[in-house]
Amino acid sequence: MLTYALVGLEPRRVEVEAHLQKGVPSFAIVGLADRACQEAKERVRSGIVSAELEWPLRRITVNLAPAELRKEGSGFDLTIALAILAASHQIPAGSLREHAAVGELALDGRVRPVGGALVVAEGARRAGIEFVLCAAESAGEVALAGVDPVPVHHLAEAVAYMRGDWLPKPAPPSSANGGAHVTCPDLAEVKGQRRGRRALEIAAAGRHNLLLAGPPGTGKTMLARRLPGILPELAREEALEVTRIHSVVGLLPSGQPLVAEPPFRAPHHSSSMPAIVGGGSGPSPGEASLAHRGVLLLDEFPEFQRPVLEALRQPLEDGVVSVARANGRATFPARFQLVATMNLCPCGGRGDAAGCSCSAVRLARFREKLSRALLDRFDLVVAMPRPRASELDGSGEETSALVRERVQAARSRLEARPPRMSSEARALLTEAVERLPLSGRGRARVARVARTIAALAGSDEIAREHLAEALSYRIPPELTGK
């Protein structure tokens, strides 16, 4: 019977074979199975007995082919159990050829969901298999792959289905994981910070990386956490990409398998390299991949380990994370929008009326964490001063819903007919390259931001004022000391 192992986000075909022969009763699993997979012996034996089926008193050998592919996890349990039951003539062996299976068995025979059911179902579809037996909770994500799920709650139901004695109820139609804009904090709650709000809108419209810098209490984190609320829903293909990643790590909510909203991830600054970029013995996706097609917020940006920050340079450029291990390489998509917040100095007083108390040495060490190459990958850098009391008491700020409409309109314009740069804007850009410390990458990013600003303005042409605003968001001297 067929199932699939996961190598990154790719399904690798695994044929589960069971052989029974006379001899001292025993049960062995061969085929480079890890510990969790080897422990299936106890779960499968208990599950078959709990389903009031006969456990064969034979020498049982289960082979997971191909042998050179490492098999990890408990998702092979259901397939192993059905293969043994077919080998012992308790279910028709011929019916196994038309089905794939994925699921973990409890000791009482219940079928539990496992991560990656969507990826397994996609592998089955490519192999021409139309039916996938799975836990009832996984039926929604299996259906997303374009195959027919066979949702079962218990091994006994799977056996009855294979015998032709029982048909499962059709799985209820899965709903998208919507509602993120309802629960996301509203942009209207942010008082003042006109420049920060403007930069947030530009970042949302053009999918630009954004760095908010300023003293504590100026609303940097508050503003950054409202970015998901002004982002449009994902396109169908984008939603499937995100759902595939979240399926592998088991983060899909039951009943809402399709992630239709851009994901938002905010890891703690103490997070390790594997936690951020992915890794482990598996390996598995990290926060960078879990934020694919969404937002990765790094609050207190300089507090992250420098190797972790530097490791983000590759996915920021290429949109993928490659994790190499002795047994192979796994690649995960990681095309995320990076949003970071930071103080301007270790004590936080720089840029505030209280003033900075840091020594020159301490300030230099603080800035060393932020390499020029990393800062250059931010399209928008905004210094956020402390708002005035009159701004905090004000009202009438724009809501997230209103800003999201403008963001969607700008994105549609960028996709249909991107604005072209005028001769005046081109001359200003040439002058900026000559006078400012602007790298080739920085020049391209300024042009992209100017294009987004023009789209937000409803213009078919990048005017001089659009480019001037884009240049104003480049790296301020207070971040580098130059």
Model-derived regions: residue spans:
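Walker B catalytic acidic pair
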Residues: 293, 299-301, 311
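The Walker A (P-loop) glycine that initiates the GxxxxGKT/S ATP-binding motif of P-loop NTPases
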Residues: 214, 278, 300
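Peripheral, non-AAA+ core regions of ATP-driven protein-machinery
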Residues: 1-211, 215-221, 324, 460-482
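Basic, amphipathic alpha-helical bundle interface domains used for macromolecular binding and assembly
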Residues: 30-41, 56, 63-73, 283, ...
